[in-house]
Amino acid sequence: MSKEDKEKTQIIDKDLDLSNAGRGVWLVKVPKYIAQKWEKAPTNMDVGKLRINKTPGQKAQVSLSLTPAVLALDPEEKIPTEHILDVSQVTKQTLGVFSHMAPSDGKENSTTSAAQPDNEKLYMEGRIVQKLECRPIADNCYMKLKLESIRKASEPQRRVQPIDKIVQNFKPVKDHAHNIEYRERKKAEGKKARDDKNAVMDMLFHAFEKHQYYNIKDLVKITNQPISYLKEILKDVCDYNMKNPHKNMWELKKEYRHYKTEEKKEEEHKSGSSDSE
């Protein structure tokens, strides 16, 4: 609730009729099929008979029998007739049953009651002293009802339904856009032709002047040569690294390198490490 709604809300003090506050009331929980029957029943119909059998030194046995009039509301629906009520005392809670009554003697009174909520009367019908849970007797009728409820619960929500006509969610096309784009790109690139070996080697030497290590994909882009033909030339002038940190990369063979200073440092480092050992 927003701040504006709280400001608009009016707190009205009303009198509560407590004349029946001392009356004990039972709170009964019934199965869903009984509640549905009772909702369909008219107000003046007897919906059931309650029997209380009291035995000295034992708990009272309470049973409920539905009347034939209630069962006749929907004859096709077979439900159990006899039920047992399990009784439990309410000791650590204070629960009450309340009702309200607003005057509804025509349209004028209904409008005045809406405009003047003070006309509404509140009653306390009693204090809940016992809770009862209604459960059916396990007879054949109840077993059939239970099996039917289990069957309905196990039915899948989605069902496979055969259709007698074709349902097209998309229009068929001769070719897809990404396939056409791929073929056009391949045509634009053209077929890679083999250049002269010396010309390819010149391109490789020029590339290795910029970087010491290359992977095969970059060299294919630089030379624009078929990968099989390029590998043949690389085997003549380059070494393929099989170990980290430059694994799966190509570098020029020692006889073709121009960075002698770096090689000397590496050799000095290797010789220094061998002397220390």
UniProtKB/Swiss-Prot annotation:
Cite a GO CC annotation: transcription factor TFIIF complex
Annotated GO biological process: transcription by RNA polymerase II; transcription elongation by RNA polymerase II; transcription initiation at RNA polymerase II promoter
- Compartmental location: Nucleus
Q: Which CDD domains match?
A: TFIIF_beta
- Please provide the record's keywords in A-Z order: DNA-binding, Nucleus, Transcription, Transcription regulation
Family annotation (InterPro entries): TFIIF_beta, TFIIF_beta_HTH, TFIIF_beta_N, TFIIF_interaction, WH-like_DNA-bd_sf, WH_DNA-bd_sf
Q: Which domain of life is it from?
A: Eukaryota
Q: Name any one Pfam family assigned in the record.
A: TFIIF_beta_N
Q: Which molecular function term from Gene Ontology is one that the record holds?
A: DNA binding
Question: Which family, according to UniProt?
Answer: Belongs to the TFIIF beta subunit family.
Q: Which PANTHER family match?
A: GENERAL TRANSCRIPTION FACTOR IIF SUBUNIT 2 (PTHR10445:SF0)
* Subunit details: Heterodimer of an alpha and a beta subunit.
- Described function: TFIIF is a general transcription initiation factor that binds to RNA polymerase II and helps to recruit it to the initiation complex in collaboration with TFIIB.
Q: What is this protein called?
A: General transcription factor IIF subunit 2
Natural source organism: Drosophila melanogaster (Fruit fly)
Give the gene name: TfIIFbeta
